[in-house]
């Protein structure tokens, strides 16, 4: 997908809580769309992008009771967590900006990852 096919959203909030670098790069975190009440069912992806490369990375949903506890008024956020594993040989070395994709909406997380 071209970046133009995603809708820029200021309603997406979240964080990458853990980055584990080994044979794989494992990222764990969470994000929601604060303007939606359908967060448990959202498709979440990450985009790694720099001036040369862009990678769209699928994630696996993960239960996050801590996010639900922090937002008790939001019953739709318990499954807003994600985990993804990236084989190092599948991504070129470099510094990447990380974007959160929630369904077809995108937001720059402010996070950079060095591979």
Positions of predicted regions on the chain:
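Basic, ligand-binding patches in group-transfer machinery
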Residues: 1-115
